């Protein structure tokens, strides 16, 4: 879930702290990526619908390969542009998240029931909508993703708990430059720079949103603890939300009272009932001091791709097109060995002007010199991967 309504609130209250960028703007940057969120996006993007049946990207053996296709293609696209992706995987969820996870399971069950009803009624639109709400990333898919990345020579970090918190730790300790995730709570965990839409496909044509925490705090006048309290009131994964407290009231409440304790004392009990389990002190402490592996103990190293291992895994086991895989390996080698010029900010101190965010999008219609798979739309025939959309009965 992340933080409900935080993105819109920041666009309204601190737009100068947000930039709109393109992939090429991160040349030479190490980016810590929320792996589970990214893989979930790939599975959703490649899940289609046709003639009343769900469709998924599979190989000739019928195995779902959406996660591997998306991860392979998008990672290659990033390294082509000079990025250095670091994928961080979730560990054990914190106890505070138990209620949220239970609610997610219930919502998935309800979505499945609605899907079944829509199927009986022949409502294709509702079936497609509900089918995406039932998607879950399996343990097997996560392990396959780790294996693929390691064979590609891309760093993999296993977080002890929340991936966003571990990503923030890497950025705070200068092991990476930014966190890439769709969950806004990366900022709540203290990530100095956060990117949204980094792993979106080119077909979506959405610019990357770059959030700067120091500027957000400076423009809004909030301390980090007040920002955390604001996020808790907006709605997070660790405590239930107070009914009747929306973004505007949460903002005004923290600006006026300074913290949740004082705000709660001012609430009209008849209008706002604080739910049982609103342990905001524990949530606040978890945001301030989450369970992470200290960045100093993590080695980040980009390695030569394992050609033999990739061919065995992707071509022999997962039935990928061999030519596509070999070309991908060469692209990885080119990125690893390329003699690149340093970024200017490695030699000079760059002062970022506080201005209106750059809204320049990438030019549409420009053909790329390499192949990439679209992560949206319906694939009717085999693509360069050798895989195709099949009806899931």
From Swiss-Prot:
Residues 340-348 are annotated as: Interaction with PCNA. Its cofactor is Mg(2+). One of its GO terms (biological process) is base-excision repair. Keywords: DNA damage, DNA repair, DNA replication, Endonuclease, Exonuclease, Hydrolase, Magnesium, Metal-binding, Mitochondrion, Nuclease, Nucleus, Phosphoprotein. Residues 126-257 are annotated as: I-domain. It is an enzyme of class 3 (hydrolase). GO terms for molecular function: 5'-3' exonuclease activity; 5'-flap endonuclease activity; DNA binding; magnesium ion binding. DNA binds at residues 74, 162, 235, 237. Mg(2+) 1 binds at residues 34, 90, 162, 164. Pfam families: XPG_I, XPG_N. Its EC number is 3.1.-.-. The keyword Cytoplasm does not apply. Phosphorylated. Phosphorylation upon DNA damage induces relocalization to the nuclear plasma. Residues 1-108 are annotated as: N-domain. It is found in: Nucleus, Nucleolus; Nucleus, Nucleoplasm; Mitochondrion. Mg(2+) 2 binds at residues 183, 185, 237. Its main location: nucleus. The keyword Cytoplasm does not apply. It comes from the Eukaryota. PANTHER family: FLAP ENDONUCLEASE 1, FLAP ENDONUCLEASE FAMILY MEMBER. Structure-specific nuclease with 5'-flap endonuclease and 5'-3' exonuclease activities involved in DNA replication and repair. During DNA replication, cleaves the 5'-overhanging flap structure that is generated by displacement synthesis when DNA polymerase encounters the 5'-end of a downstream Okazaki fragment. It enters the flap from the 5'-end and then tracks to cleave the flap base, leaving a nick for ligation. Also involved in the long patch base excision repair (LP-BER) pathway, by cleaving within the apurinic/apyrimidinic (AP) site-terminated flap. Belongs to the XPG/RAD2 endonuclease family. FEN1 subfamily. Interacts with PCNA. Three molecules of FEN1 bind to one PCNA trimer with each molecule binding to one PCNA monomer. PCNA stimulates the nuclease activity without altering cleavage specificity. HAMAP family: Fen (MF_00614). This is Flap endonuclease 1. It comes from Trypanosoma cruzi (strain CL Brener). The lineage of its organism: Eukaryota, Discoba, Euglenozoa, Kinetoplastea, Metakinetoplastina.
């Amino acid at each position: 879930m992340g933080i409900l309504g935080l993105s819109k609130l920041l666009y309204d209250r601190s737009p100068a702290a947000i930039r709109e960028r393109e992939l090429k703007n991160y040349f030479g940057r190490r980016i810590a990526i929320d792996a589970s969120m990214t893989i979930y996006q790939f599975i959703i993007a490649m899940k289609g619908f046709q003639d009343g049946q769900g469709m998924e990207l599979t190989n000739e053996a019928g195995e779902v390969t959406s996660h591997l296709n998306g991860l392979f293609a998008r990672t290659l696209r990033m390294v082509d542009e000079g990025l250095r992706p670091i994928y961080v995987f979730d560990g054990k969820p914190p106890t505070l998240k138990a209620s949220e996870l239970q609610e997610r399971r219930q919502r998935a069950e309800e979505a499945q029931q609605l899907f079944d009803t829509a199927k009986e009624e022949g409502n294709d639109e509702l079936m497609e909508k509900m089918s995406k709400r039932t998607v879950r990333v399996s343990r097997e898919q996560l392990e396959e993703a780790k294996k693929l990345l390691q064979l590609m020579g891309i760093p993999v970090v296993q977080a002890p708990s929340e991936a966003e918190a571990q990503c923030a730790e890497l950025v705070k300790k200068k092991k990476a430059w930014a966190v890439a995730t769709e969950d806004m709570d990366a900022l709540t965990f203290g990530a100095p720079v956060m990117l949204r839409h980094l792993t979106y496909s080119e077909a979506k044509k959405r610019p990357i949103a770059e959030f700067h925490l120091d500027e957000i705090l400076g423009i809004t006048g909030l301390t980090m603890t007040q920002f955390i309290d604001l996020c808790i009131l907006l709605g997070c994964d660790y405590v239930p939300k107070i009914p009747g407290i929306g973004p505007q009231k949460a903002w005004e409440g923290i600006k006026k009272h300074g913290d949740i304790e004082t705000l709660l004392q001012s609430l009209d009990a008849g209008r706002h009932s604080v739910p049982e389990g609103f342990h905001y002190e524990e949530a606040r402490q978890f945001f301030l001091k989450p369970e992470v592996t200290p960045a100093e103990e993590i080695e980040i190293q980009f390695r030569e791709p394992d050609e033999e291992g990739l061919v065995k895994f992707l071509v022999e086991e997962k039935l990928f097109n061999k030519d596509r895989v070999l070309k991908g390996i060469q692209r990885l080698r080119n990125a690893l060995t390329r003699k690149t010029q340093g970024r200017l900010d490695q030699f000079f101190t760059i002062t970022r002007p506080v201005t209106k965010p750059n809204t320049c999008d990438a030019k549409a219609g420009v053909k790329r010199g390499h192949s990439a798979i679209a992560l949206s739309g319906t694939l009717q025939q085999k693509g360069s991967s050798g895989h195709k959309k099949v009806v899931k009965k």
